């Protein structure tokens, strides 16, 4: 991609039209002009009286390298000869009030390691990618009808070196990728990697949207990490925050002394809880900054998806006492998604949205917001509230486990067991479970069994796979020493077997976005807190029966209605002794009894384990078998408008 000479820029392209390559104009670009090598600096500061580039190369002297204003709307530019990659710099901006403030470059692709805040000249071009096979394979698949298991992680606290220092992007190739492959996750979702000054913001309060944080290395190092992920069949999703940004003095806030990237109106500018300000999504220059940024990460870093943070905060104005939709944000999100899918129709655009806004995952040409996935926050909240309840009282909130199926197909959902639920005093997933030590592990195994068999793609935050006991401590790494304890090893073994079963079982994902992929057997047994249901794939024989018991009672010869296959095998039981359970399993092949039950043509009698999930697979169908209504069993149609773009 060539750098566009600023003098040739048509004003309308950046200021009034959709212009999604603004990173080619703005920022610091190593170029040759008039046969002289140097760096061209270009910045947008509409209310600046004067601008300079300052750095070590001119001893931070505001007078030496004054920039030229090349458009009336406030584009400033300067070519400085004979400076090279690696130079640190900032913009010195004289405000309308006569003050001189120092700002990092909004379009810088590299920055100093915190606590330093200067931008760094870096030639981002030149990385040689080796992921053609990944791209080709990705285009052959439909993400809607494939297994998807996402491992959410914080790059700085997944694992640290013995001396407490961080692993680099390149070092994480050897540490993280084999672990993800071993656990058969299809994707990793990394909490924000844009440059940010404060570690404990986790990257959600950024100052450098185009700069991969230098905490872990250079932009090319991150490209290498993504390249290696693709080599091993792992997709990379980034957490991305287009709604708000931090107020640090060197960042975007009051960039030229006046609200530039943020709203002017204080009522809608501020996020008091987060201490951030909202992007002015009604301003064309801001839209071009953000949408160009999304495409920049796609084009330069080969990212496979974004989890768009805080969509609810974007959709609604945060005026006190009001709930009014922000039409700027609505039209921005539609424009963003159209641009992203025009670039890559196989991209993952996931909305982190807790509202009931309709048609979030419906294409824009059908009136939707245009995402293709949405976190199912309602499912997460209901299920965790249910699990935290004492087992003997769960029968009184039975509907929390069934309500999600009333809307499960209204959007394309991802089920998130995310970082938000295991921090700030909320406890880890394991420690949310009531009861004694054994009970906690049994119920976490049960939760995971329900999680992997419920419709929707899957996301789990790091540490959950082996039963992290403490909640997430963002300044420390995970408690890897827990593998020294038997119950955590059992949990880890169970999780790996469960995810492997999920990936090889088409009924658990093939019709995730079609109501024909799910059928309740018994949703109403609140007295015993037992749920049973069927997951169905495209083919008749691609069916699984799932039975979940959310109390500690054991039931012998429990009747479960099933489709009329001759036999069933129990292919997973969370109470198996090899997973730390009590061993109440169904070892023998289960012969169906041809008597209707639960509105099914037949039933089986099984042992239901305490706090257990049992997954049954049909073995053999009867010739000419009929359903209860007398019609022959047939393959269900999977025609649906959901799960498509």
Swiss-Prot record:
Residues 619-645 are annotated as: Disordered. PANTHER family: 1,4-ALPHA-GLUCAN-BRANCHING ENZYME. Keywords: Carbohydrate metabolism, Glycogen biosynthesis, Glycogen metabolism, Glycosyltransferase, Transferase. It comes from Bacillus cereus (strain B4264). This is 1,4-alpha-glucan branching enzyme GlgB. Pathway: Glycan biosynthesis; glycogen biosynthesis. GO terms for molecular function: 1,4-alpha-glucan branching enzyme activity; cation binding; hydrolase activity, hydrolyzing O-glycosyl compounds. It comes from the Bacteria. It holds the Pfam family CBM_48.
């Amino acid at each position: 991609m060539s750098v566009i000479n600023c003098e040739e820029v048509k004003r309308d392209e950046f200021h009034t039209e959709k212009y999604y390559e603004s990173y080619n104009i703005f920022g610091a670009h190593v170029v040759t002009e008039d046969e002289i090598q140097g760096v061209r600096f270009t910045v947008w500061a509409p209310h600046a009286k004067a601008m300079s580039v300052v750095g070590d190369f001119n001893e931070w002297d505001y007078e030496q390298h004054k920039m030229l204003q090349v458009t009336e709307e406030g584009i400033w530019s300067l070519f400085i000869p004979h400076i090279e990659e690696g130079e640190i710099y900032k913009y010195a901006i004289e405000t309308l009030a006569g003050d001189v403030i120092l700002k990092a470059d909004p379009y810088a692709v590299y920055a100093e390691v915190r606590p330093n805040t200067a931008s760094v000249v870096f030639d981002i071009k030149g990385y040689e990618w080796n992921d053609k096979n990944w791209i080709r394979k990705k285009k052959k698949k439909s993400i809607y009808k494939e297994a998807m298991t996402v491992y959410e992680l914080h790059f700085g606290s997944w694992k640290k070196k013995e001396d407490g220092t961080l692993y680099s992007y390149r070092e994480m190739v050897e540490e993280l990728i084999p672990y993800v492959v071993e656990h058969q996750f299809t994707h990793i979702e990394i909490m924000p990697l844009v440059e940010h000054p404060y570690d404990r913001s986790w990257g959600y309060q950024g100052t450098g949207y185009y700069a991969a944080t230098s905490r872990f290395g250079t932009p090319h190092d991150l490209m290498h990490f993504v390249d290696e992920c693709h080599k091993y069949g792992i997709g990379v999703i980034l957490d991305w925050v287009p709604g708000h940004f931090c107020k640090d003095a060197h960042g975007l806030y009051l960039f030229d002394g006046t609200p530039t990237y943020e709203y002017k109106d204080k009522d809608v500018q501020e996020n008091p809880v987060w201490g951030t300000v909202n992007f002015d999504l009604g301003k064309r220059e801001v839209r071009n900054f953000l949408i160009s940024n999304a495409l920049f990460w796609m084009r330069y870093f080969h990212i496979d998806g974004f989890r768009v943070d805080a969509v609810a905060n974007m959709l609604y104005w945060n005026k006190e006492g009001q709930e009014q939709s922000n039409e700027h944000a609505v039209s921005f999100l539609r424009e963003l998604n159209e641009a992203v899918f025009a670039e890559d129709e196989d991209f993952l655009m996931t909305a982190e949205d807790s509202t009931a806004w309709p048609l979030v995952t419906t294409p824009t040409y059908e009136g939707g917001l245009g995402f293709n996935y949405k976190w199912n926050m309602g499912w997460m909240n209901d299920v965790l509230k249910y699990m935290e309840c004492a087992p003997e009282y769960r029968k009184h909130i039975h509907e929390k486990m069934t309500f999600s199926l009333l809307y499960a197909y209204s959007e394309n959902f991802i089920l998130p067991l995310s970082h938000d639920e295991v921090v700030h005093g909320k406890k880890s997933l394991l420690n949310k479970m009531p009861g004694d030590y054994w009970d906690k592990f049994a119920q976490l195994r049960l939760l995971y069994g329900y999680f992997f068999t419920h419709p929707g793609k899957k996301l789990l935050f790091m540490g959950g796979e082996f039963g992290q006991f403490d909640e997430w401590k963002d300044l420390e790494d995970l408690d890897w020493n827990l593998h020294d304890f038997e119950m955590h090893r059992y949990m880890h073994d169970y999780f790996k077997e469960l995810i492997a079963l999920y990936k090889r079982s088409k009924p658990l994902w093939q019709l995730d976005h079609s109501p024909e992929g799910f059928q309740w057997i018994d949703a109403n047994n609140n007295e015993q807190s037992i749920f049973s249901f069927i997951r169905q794939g495209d083919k008749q024989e691609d069916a699984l029966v799932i039975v979940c018991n959310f109390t500690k009672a054991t039931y012998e010869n429990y009747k479960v209605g099933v489709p009329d296959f001759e036999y069933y095998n129990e292919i997973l039981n969370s109470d198996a002794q090899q997973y730390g359970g009590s061993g109440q399993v169904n070892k023998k092949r289960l012969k169906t009894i041809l008597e209707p039950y639960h509105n099914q043509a037949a039933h089986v009698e099984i042992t239901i384990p305490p706090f257990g999930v049992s997954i049954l697979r049909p073995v053999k169908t009867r010739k000419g078998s009929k359903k209860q209504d007398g019609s022959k069993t047939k393959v269900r149609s999977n025609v649906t408008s959901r799960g498509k773009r």
